[in-house]
Amino acid sequence: MQYEIGVETMKVLLINGSPHEQGCTNRALEEVASSLKANGVDSEIFWIGKGSIRGCVACGSCGGVSNKCLFDDKVNEALEKMKEADALIVGSPVYYASLNGSLSAFLDRMFYAGACFHHKPAAAVASARRAGTTATLDIIQKYFTISQMPIVSSQYWNMVHGSSAEDVEKDLEGLQTMRTLGKNMAWMLKCIEAGKKAGIDIPDTEDKIKTNFIR
């Protein structure tokens, strides 16, 4: 069963920021996707790949409103998908208590070029052998909070543990946390849609005021 938004189905874009397409991060996202499906919400896992992803060069070509980066690669592919998505989940492996470098460059460019994130629910997921997960989640969530995206939580911090996808199968609490995240994301999307149908509009955004610390 799928929950309908008018004539369209709600959809969540899940970004796999690991260089391993079928690794721990993907296994976590698969569990979220399964839970979303069980709760009537469609999803797609988008893998950023293991090729080189260049960082933002602050050229300003995107203008922050065009939804397109000058460098036409997977970042623009994800932006096109995000235009149609109703929510976003970003997953990353832990590298030195942070997200991996490729994903960092990917998110910098995607969020700077994109104007399609406001008021769409979001969540971060981290995978690690041991520690560094909460620091990684904090960094990813900063992209969401500066973009006016409501953050969806779970029963615990959104993390799984293991050195391989097979290891993650043993992290029963981690997988349950992913399923709860999927349920909560589906619930949030349905609440937002119910609000729209009841006449509750998305908040207006003021023209941005910039104040420098040093003049």
Question: Where is each model-derived feature located?
Answer:
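N-terminal beta1-alpha1 ligand-phosphate binding loop
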Residues: 11-39
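A short beta-strand-loop structural module common to alpha/beta enzyme folds
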Residues: 41-51
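Short, Lys/Arg-enriched N-terminal segments with co-localized hydrophobic residues
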Residues: 1-9
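Cofactor-binding loop segments of dinucleotide-utilizing enzymes, especially the Rossmann-like FAD-
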Residues: 15-17, 48, 126-129
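Helix-loop-strand module that forms the ligand-binding subsite of alpha/beta enzymes
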Residues: 64-156
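Glycine-rich phosphate/pyrophosphate-binding loop and the adjoining helix
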Residues: 150-215
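Cysteine-cluster motifs in flexible loop/terminal segments that predominantly coordinate metals
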Residues: 51-82, 206-215
